[in-house]
Structure formats: structure tokens, C-alpha cells
Amino acid sequence: MNASLTPNETTVQNVKLLIDGEWVESQTTEWHDIVNPATQQVLAKVPFATASEVDAAISAAHRAFQTWKLTPIGARMRIMLKLQALIREHSKRIAAVLSAEQGKTIADAEGDIFRGLEVVEHACSIGTLQMGEFAENVAGGVDTYTLRQPI
């Protein structure tokens, strides 16, 4: 999405696919408009990925998991802490995008972001739950259960 989200925006961005760590243009002929329900302005176009693009993404995810599952818990936690910091740093922009995409008020969008941030904060501490635990109310009305088992 464009950073400004101005009402006079004339260029509609085609969203790229993230496959194997790279942003790639889709080869699809089918696109879905992301429309601001309040203004009917088309904000972006999202591709309906082709079968080969889906296969490539699945294959890349499978390869990535082979190393991710060997990543120490502390390193995983640092990645989640970085995500937490990025959400906090960019929360106003994320709220603006969410508001435009869903027609929510900024206050509603900020509330959604805060709720998501609560889940990310819980994920930051997931390493302490590796023995398997049930945690109640990690976010308003959200409980989590962790179970350590090989995949």
C-alpha cells in the first residue's frame, strides 16, 4: 500500500507475492480489488496466485521450516521481539491501512492492532511454555495452549 493513503491517489498498486523471501510480481490474470468501503476507492489490487506460484510458496515454506525448527528458542524470541517493536513503531500507519481497507474508524483499527500486539507479546514469551501449558486470558478473551511435539 502507498504510505500516504490520500483521497486523491490516482495510482493503484498491484500487491506483490512474497515467495522464498523475495517480492515477486504475480503472473496471474485474476486480481481482486481492495476497496475502501467508505469511499469505494480502489486502494490496491491483490493477485489470485497461480497454481505454480502457490506451489513455489509452499515449497519455500517447507524449506524454511527445515532450518526454523532448528533455530534456538532465544533466537526465535528475538525475532518476535523485533516484530513487536515494528508493530509499535508503525502502529499509526498500520491503523490507517486497516481503517481504509475495512472502513473502520481509526480508534477501532488501533484497538485491533493493540489486540494483535497482545498476542505477539505472548508469543515473545512462548519459549517459557515449551513444556506445554495452558495460559488463560493472554489477551481479552483469548486463551492459548502450547504443546511440544515433533512435526
Predicted segments, located by residue:
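Glycine-rich loop-to-alpha-helix module at the N-terminal edge of alpha/beta enzyme cores
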Residues: L43-Q130
